[in-house]
């Protein structure tokens, strides 16, 4: 009796292991960013298997609340029927997981190139960049210095007096500032020379600018002057804030709070970001596209002939399989199988009876369990196997009882020769077997072995054999008549 209790313990332990709901079951094709379904992605009845379809390039789309979803193809294979139907599902990544993945990606060094459209728009809107070491940084407000010409031109001294004070300038330039505006160096200070403007006649004038320093010796204001012709009279034509000058900004690293705030404010995930986010995200639910196509099997036909009446009875059995999805958009959706069988009986071509039966097969229940709270002083114990599997225990006990002597059945067994005999002749349903999915692990790929070409060849051979049989029958018939 100890054996069946050990069997009960193992069965109960297996049931308990299926109770706890885990993450979405996936597999990743090597060297890709594509999730594929596994046989445990969806709960199915024992006679149904979910097989992945080889797909390297992921199809990704947006879902509500700033999430992303990747489509995955598979096939539901019904064992007893040797047939399968295609099924499409989506591995869903919620907005919270996507944002966490974006943060991890931006924090990873060396990821400054090849970013997706959504992440690129985030960097543009938040004014963030990657530095040379691959770290995400932001410009320092108010920082930087004026951009000087790579090769400053030293101006010759020429002194004039104007309303703005005494300035050292030059009439001779290399290159001529009338054609090359930009920053120039004069007496060690940056000087801006703008474009030339025509003021009429043959006279021209151009602008000069000087940078005023603040108390700390930093440039903070720009004053412009103009030379109005041969009299070299200088006048103040206005000032410009240094903020409007071209500068080389200084950058500082982002804090975690700034990074999270920027992602919350500016980030709109794009399917193009999938390749960047993939190493940092995991799907948190799976959605099956419904309805799943029905499986309509070829009818099975059998016939019999009554030797006394000569009547021919034909029985036609048709079967269709429907799939019903429950717990969709969860960590492990369920698929139930509804199998409908219709049996029509014909006698000499007339329908005499019709019967339809439907069988529903559900996947094994995962069950529920509530572990004891910590500090309760009681340990979790598995229930007694025979307390919930009484029928199994009773049957096992019955098999252990000694077998009685074989009874004498000669009084109820007799040889009866005068019985009606029937003969069923069937050549099958002419249906082609379903493809067989072969997983080649060392190549990390799945191959569907199809029998379509063989079935087409068999169909051609069938007609050739039947034609040959008719010709042979005609030859035999003619030989008998002539003989």
From Swiss-Prot:
The keyword Membrane applies. One of its GO terms (biological process) is entry receptor-mediated virion attachment to host cell. Its main location: virion. Keywords: Host membrane, Host-virus interaction, Membrane, Signal, Transmembrane, Transmembrane helix, Viral attachment to host adhesion receptor, Viral attachment to host cell, Viral attachment to host cell pilus, Viral attachment to host entry receptor, Viral extrusion, Viral penetration into host cytoplasm, Viral penetration into host cytoplasm via pilus retraction, Viral release from host cell, Virion, Virus entry into host cell. Residues 324-343, 354-378 are annotated as: Disordered. Residues 1-20 form the signal peptide. The chain crosses the membrane at residues 460-480. Belongs to the inovirus G3P protein family. This is Attachment protein G3P. The gene is III.
């Amino acid at each position: 009796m100890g054996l069946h209790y050990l069997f009960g313990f193992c069965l109960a332990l297996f049931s308990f292991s299926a109770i706890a709901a885990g993450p979405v079951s996936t597999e990743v094709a090597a060297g890709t960013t594509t999730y594929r379904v596994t046989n445990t992605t969806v709960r199915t009845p024992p006679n149904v298997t979910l097989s992945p379809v080889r797909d390297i390039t992921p199809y990704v789309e947006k879902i509500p609340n700033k999430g992303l979803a990747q489509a995955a193809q598979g096939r539901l294979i019904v064992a007893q029927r040797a047939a399968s139907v295609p099924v499409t599902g989506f591995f869903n990544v919620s907005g919270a997981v996507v944002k966490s993945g974006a943060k991890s990606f931006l924090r990873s060094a060396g990821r400054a190139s090849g970013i997706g459209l959504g992440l690129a728009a985030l960097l543009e809107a938040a004014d963030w960049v990657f530095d040379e070491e691959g770290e995400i940084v932001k410009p320092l407000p108010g920082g930087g210095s004026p951009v000087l010409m790579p090769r400053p031109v030293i101006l010759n001294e020429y002194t004039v007096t104007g309303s703005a004070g005494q300035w050292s300038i030059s009439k001779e330039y290399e290159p001529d500032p009338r054609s090359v505006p930009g920053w120039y160096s004069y007496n060690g200070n940056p000087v801006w020379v703008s474009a030339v403007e025509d003021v009429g006649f043959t006279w021209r004038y151009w602008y000069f600018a000087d940078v005023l320093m603040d108390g700390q010796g930093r440039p903070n204001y720009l004053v412009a002057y103009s030379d109005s012709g041969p009299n070299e009279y200088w006048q103040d034509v206005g000032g410009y804030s240094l903020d409007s000058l071209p500068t080389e900004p200084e950058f500082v690293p982002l804090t975690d709070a700034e990074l999270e705030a920027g992602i919350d404010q500016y980030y709109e995930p794009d399917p193009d970001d999938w390749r960047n986010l993939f190493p940092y995200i995991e799907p948190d639910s799976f959605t099956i596209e419904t309805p799943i196509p029905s499986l309509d099997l070829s009818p099975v036909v059998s016939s019999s002939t009554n030797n006394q009446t000569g009547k021919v009875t034909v029985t036609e059995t048709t079967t269709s399989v429907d799939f019903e999805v429950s717990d969709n958009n969860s960590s492990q959706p369920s698929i139930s199988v509804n199998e409908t069988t219709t049996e029509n009986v014909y006698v000499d071509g007339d329908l005499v009876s019709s019967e339809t039966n439907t069988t529903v097969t559900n996947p094994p229940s995962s069950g529920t369990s509530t572990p004891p709270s910590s500090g309760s002083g009681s340990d979790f114990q598995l229930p007694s196997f025979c307390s919930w599997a009484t029928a199994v225990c009773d049957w096992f006990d019955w098999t252990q009882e000694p077998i009685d002597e074989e009874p004498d059945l000669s009084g109820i067994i007799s040889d009866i020769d005068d019985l009606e005999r029937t003969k069923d002749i069937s050549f099958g349903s002419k249906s082609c077997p379903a493809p067989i999915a072969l997983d080649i692990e060392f190549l990390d790929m799945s191959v569907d072995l199809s029998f379509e070409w063989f079935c087409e060849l068999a169909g051609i051979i069938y007609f050739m054999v039947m034609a040959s049989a008719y010709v042979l029958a005609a030859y035999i018939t003619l030989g008998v008549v002539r003989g």
